[in-house]
Amino acid sequence: MRGAHAYFSGSGNIRLHYRCWDVPTPRAVVIVCHGLGEHGGRYEELAQDFARAGLSTYALDHRGHGRSDGRRGHVRRFTRYVHDLEKFRRRVYGAVGPDLPLIFLGHSLGGLIMIRYLQEYPGVPARGAVLSAPLLGVAMEVPQWKARLSSILYYAIPALPMNTGLDPEVLSHDPQVVEAYKRDALVHDRITPRLYGEIHSEIDQAFAKVSQLRLPVLMLIPSADKLVRPDLMQRFAADLRRKSPVQVRTFAGLYHEVLNETTRSSVVADILGWIERRIPEHSGSPPAAESAS
């Protein structure tokens, strides 16, 4: 199955690109939010896995990413991402219908966007959210001088393009994944002082408003993540568990992109098993009870 390409108008009328992998009679639809510097096309293999399970997949390219318009790695306000996602959800519902069960899946920056979206739109009719290594704390060491400079540039030159310093080798143990990432013309390594500052501010907001996220959550935590702190993912899951059903899967020794690791088949199986419990035979029926673990 080949994904189709389309565009729509995001917040502020920016042109945003998305891909969709529709199955003939879907049992549910999954909305995917990608990470910093990448794009929705990198989730094609996952979309194929979902298609075989009867799930349609829609993957947005965030503004400043992939085929979407906008300066690479820049956003004036993080809330733009959040509002873009709501407009995208409405677009997806217009295509598949509002009665189809909806699942969210967000990776890294996309996970943070999804958390803040679900906190700001608590009434969204979704069955649950899969958070893959959500950006809840940066593991990469940032020199103190660079952090101070970014704080100044946040106001002085907010759109100044800077290098993220991301090493593709720490994304996955699979050399083919790493090489494909390096060769991908739609991948970028840019971040601006404004986006850097907005990310840190929104991480604080995610923890402060954890009780506002009321959906069932599957948290995927790679223990050897060198980009996002696993301990803060665990802390967020523990805080969230007070209000919402949360299942945590920790993957020993895996790097940041658990969906692209050498053992991805077992990760995908975990996701599909969790989704199955969220979408009973009759979409109008209440989801099956799930124990937190």
Predicted regions and their residues:
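N-terminal cap/lid segment of alpha/beta-hydrolase-fold proteins
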Residues: 1-23
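Active-site glycine-rich loops that stabilize anionic/oxyanionic intermediates
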Residues: 27, 35-38
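Catalytic nucleophile-loop/oxyanion-hole region of alpha/beta-hydrolase
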Residues: 37-40, 66-96, 100
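Alpha/beta-hydrolase-fold enzymes
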Residues: 103, 107-192
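Short alpha-helix in the alpha/beta-hydrolase fold that links the catalytic acid
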Residues: 215, 229-239
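Catalytic active-site module of serine/aspartate enzymes centered on a nucleophile-bearing elbow/loop
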Residues: 245-293
